[in-house]
Regions:
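PLP-dependent class I/II
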Residues: 1-160
Length: 160
């Protein structure tokens, strides 16, 4: 059996068999529903920890967000127009500069531009995406604290 035969052309027969066995012979429909309820509760708790950390650590004068209603991602909008260099740099250049400062502070978020449907189009907003899917509560809190420190440094805001 060639790797290409079970990887890129169609869903893997092996993974389909494993999933079938799990759902049909072990969990059943009720077990799958129980798992979905469990993961929903887990994500809700993690989301709430992240939202609490955002309220505590992020500078609202240059950042905004809406609580996620589902899923595992949290989008953070940056008011790049308030950045000291906004008249001299493009949105993409500022996004990269801010992103690098965030990484230098030991936090990791995804640049919003990575998710544009048309990367060549002109964009006049700046977002970063964070996730709360797998990190322990204390790591979420620490990451958002570091994110806030990085944003304050970039925007020359007073420390909290």
């Amino acid at each position: 059996m060639k790797h290409i035969d079970v990887s890129t052309q169609a869903p893997s027969g092996i993974s389909q068999l494993v999933l079938f066995k799990l759902l049909d012979e072990h969990w059943g429909h009720a077990g799958f529903l129980d798992w979905l309820v469990h993961i929903r509760m887990e994500y809700t708790q993690r989301r709430d920890v992240m939202l609490g950390a955002c309220e505590k650590y992020l500078p609202k004068e240059v950042m905004s967000w809406k609580p996620p209603m589902a899923g595992m991602f949290h989008w953070l909008q940056i008011e790049y127009e308030k950045h000291p260099d906004h008249k001299n740099k493009s949105v993409a250049e500022l996004e990269e500069k801010i992103f690098q400062t965030i990484v230098d502070h030991g936090a990791l978020v995804m640049k919003g531009s990575w998710f544009y449907a048309d990367s060549q189009a002109k964009h006049d907003t700046m977002f970063f995406r964070s996730t709360y899917a797998a990190a322990p509560f204390e790591k979420i809190d620490e990451a958002i604290k570091r994110l806030g420190e990085a944003i304050r440094e970039e925007f020359k805001l007073n420390s909290q």
